[in-house]
Amino acid sequence: MPDAAKKVYLIHGWGANRHAFDDLMPRLPATWPVSAVDLPGHGDAPFAQPFDIEAAADGIAAQIDTSADILGWSLGGLVALYLAARHPDKVRSLCLTASFARLTAAEDYPEGLAAPALGKMVGAFRTDYAKHIKQFLQLQLLHTPDAAEIIGRILPDLARCGTPQALQEALDAAERADARHLLDKIDVPVLLVFGGKDAITPLRMGEYLHRHLKGSRLVVMEKAAHAPFLSHAEAFAALCRDFVEGGLT
């Protein structure tokens, strides 16, 4: 069990907010002090231009009194990598799900997404966010029996995504970011959880992280897509429990 002085912090992905974890949090041990945070310009968090990944990591570090277990989803996982590299005294472990060290492809990084594919993927969110975040959730939970109940519970709060400018700047920052040089500086236990059907952060991105984060463990949920903690909430929560309590070494 985590020491009472420690906390578990959950960091959401682009275009979401802390309410993305509303269905996961009740499944985690009641003894854990868990905090889900809003990234700058998302949810209720204020936005000071420009959106900066390092500043976002520093802002979360300022909230942490002692070493904490950090779970980051997608963009939140990228922020978590910067947090662990810049503030190693604040991070006890990392759980990264559907995340990346670099989002866009490069000559030396074929694991990334091609620019046209990335533009097509996010374009819909820019035009009608509320409509497409609901469709995104429906797709993620396609084979989940209580999908409608979950979506009905989290969608109203999740749809409070922040200003269009904040979302655009956060996306621009994610496209520019490259944390590959930080990976060998991270010396904490790392759990990587990826969906086998994820087209946004494909498994190859998780495999890259696994190769370059020493001692990491990669778990693939074959039928999950970009939000394993939603589509496979019980299994995901069990992985988190085992990992944080020392079951995965």
Curated annotation (Swiss-Prot):
Database matches in InterPro entries: AB_hydrolase_1 (IPR000073), AB_hydrolase_fold (IPR029058), AB_hydrolase_sf (IPR050266), BioH (IPR010076)
Q: Which reaction does it catalyse?
A: 6-carboxyhexanoyl-[ACP] methyl ester + H2O = 6-carboxyhexanoyl-[ACP] + methanol + H(+)
| Gene3D superfamilies to which the protein is assigned, alphabetical | alpha/beta hydrolase
Hydrolase in keyword set = yes
Tell me the GO BP annotations in alphabetical order: biotin biosynthetic process
Which pathway does the protein contribute to? Cofactor biosynthesis; biotin biosynthesis
**Quick one: where is this thing mainly located?**
cytoplasm
Any one GO molecular-function label of the UniProt entry: pimelyl-[acyl-carrier protein] methyl ester esterase activity
According to the record's subunit comment, the protein's assembly and interactions are: Monomer.
Protein name per its UniProtKB record: Pimeloyl-[acyl-carrier protein] methyl ester esterase
* Organism of derivation: Neisseria gonorrhoeae (strain ATCC 700825 / FA 1090)
**Upper classification of the organism:** Bacteria, Pseudomonadati, Pseudomonadota, Betaproteobacteria, Neisseriales
